[in-house]
């Protein structure tokens, strides 16, 4: 009976090692071609490796938690293809595994909780991956239903809706989580939202300060005085990338406060537009489109520095910084410059779901040209982000909240955010950085410019 060895393949771009996270089979199990055998963690992502062999698992040569070099035998398969007269040299088997890993589509009935994609908040439930069904459609004002008078500053809140009394409660996932953290029963809350939904203010009003301290428990201090965490995998890759960027590229940062009221109105209208039914729409979508628009006007910020030359990219692979339980990752939307607003929304949604499931592949994070980090979902006003290696621009989107703002000589409450950009000063001069961020701000202030 023929025994075939499976060698750990290079599933990324020049990766040299990976950690065995979990085995999906045991010795004696029957396996088919393309059946997932093992889950590994590289310096870039978590990857499921399918078997290029058919047969019976002979021996698992590496234990979970062990880090091994590319090309190391990690398990054996007996029989199968050999019995059918099909043999495969080790090198071809390795390449087959890489090809199979790249072609496998991962689906899950429900995304794993816990992973937070910057710009989308906590992972939801009952969300399935979908493809955009109208790839060619672009957002047009005519496609929108008549907009409700948008929340004009000073407008009185909607008529309060009494507690549901056991009926369904309208509340967004972050509001439900806040209510759970504060020990507030949503069915007892009087809703003041525009369509009868429970708002953050409603929950905070219901939960008194005393209940906050009573229901949010502080973890006990561990018995051990110290904890030592081995630096490996994604954390090691993050550390190396941040050190390389911080100490090789001289960062320059600029900031601007922006009236985002019309962006909030535009997002509300998009959610009601027929073409966008079932599509995730948030201010991050407008921000992403604004970045692409501003790059076209200021192409230098979409460059890379090579010591010998500056390479200006005339395409946009738009990175979205994502915080996950495994650490920071920056997948990117390929060729974002050619996407309509609807297509970009679908691409961001796909990127979100993939990151939540921990299935972002190395290729999804390669060849980025400029990045957005949405620290606003964590309640932060702004920051000085570090450049993604190989890029010369990154923009932080701060939280969007109501603040006093002067409009036509009068102080009114408006939705305001702060944009913070970091740039590689070897490539981007201060005037270019300022013009670029001002262009981004102009779209946030008036997103209708995107439709010109």
Swiss-Prot record:
InterPro entries for this protein: 2-oxoacid_DH_actylTfrase, 2-oxoacid_DH_E2_comp, Biotin_lipoyl, CAT-like_dom_sf, E3-bd_dom_sf, PSBD, Single_hybrid_motif
EC number: 2.3.1.12
Cofactor(s) the protein requires to work: (R)-lipoate
Reactions this protein catalyses: N(6)-[(R)-dihydrolipoyl]-L-lysyl-[protein] + acetyl-CoA = N(6)-[(R)-S(8)-acetyldihydrolipoyl]-L-lysyl-[protein] + CoA
UniProt keyword Transferase, yes or no: yes
Residue spans of biased composition, Low complexity class: 135-153
Keyword flag Transferase: yes
Domain Lipoyl-binding: 3-78
Quaternary organization: Forms a 24-polypeptide structural core with octahedral symmetry.
Family: Belongs to the 2-oxoacid dehydrogenase family.
Protein name: Dihydrolipoyllysine-residue acetyltransferase component of pyruvate dehydrogenase complex
Organism: Leifsonia xyli subsp. xyli (strain CTCB07)
